[in-house]
């Protein structure tokens, strides 16, 4: 029951947004596949994602499916061949789902590694204390060959609920299937910066919900920081094996010290007003909880809401060491964040030491209204080697690349939709994509097809069906 109710809660948030003035409307007829592609300006690669059809898809730039695995990942993760002794095309996914209709996300029995041909080369789940993996929201292969998983457990959380509730636990699992390290969100409730008012509202929310959320803070991201310039300069908070997480429900981003388990860095959940701080050679000012669509950078981070995919940009990529995050502006927070009328999401690149925004993307940067780019839940953003950013506007299944100036140079709409029963017990057609991963050409077998033909979009005002 926990698995189903958790996903129902996740998807009902989206339904609430759709039924209020906080959301854009999606047309009933729209093109799918690649709709924009400029090979000269785009970073050319494959893209990996799982879709509501239950499969994991690998596409080329022209939107052709070049490979498929008949397993779902939340998210799927393709491994660098350096992590697989040179074998190409291995992915981490959920192998066996739970019995409930939505069990594949919160109640899965096993996760594992598949090779290019779909053969299982590593699996884990039956060895877990509950006999099930229950992995959700993130999975990562570590440099030592172990695997880091974000899972769901039930237990009372001090100061939140005396009854057992669904909490989230990070586990590190060895190649042999042994748990060698754990960290549980509920054990650190006093370190997340939740105000007394927020703590009271959090307790009331769990009393009203009968403790059936799928993870009471909805930690949706869990990534090792990796090598970075801050640690190299002596800042131990950014040790490479420390872990960055973010909470969708409480709107904070934090770093876990791997050695002590303590939170050693945090952004949010509540943002001060009128602060000034020096970022580099410029003075950055946070003038209010939002101006939501201020284009001035650098400036201090203003209020985020329901963000996803917070991570440190890896070494070797442009702006390495900065934090990149998809700020959804979805309903979130204890107390709830006051959202803007002109709903729109943002991609924020943040200097984690000064907490200043040094680059951002909104729909406005693509000469669209703010609401032209919006996903109230799920979604991701990844920096590419040429400086572009790959964005997953998850709610609408739209994947696209933008340049630093905001020009859209590649766009793809997920065609792999399915009818699903949501909170109202009615079937709806959904094509959402939780996360998208750019895949270098040399990560897959050499004979994998690849097409790079330019696609010029039509003039929308003259594009009609007959």
Model-derived regions: residue spans:
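Bacterial N-terminal signal peptides that target proteins for export
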Residues: 1-9
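Bacterial N-terminal signal peptides
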Residues: 8-18
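Histidine-/acidic-rich catalytic cores in large beta-rich domains
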Residues: 24-466
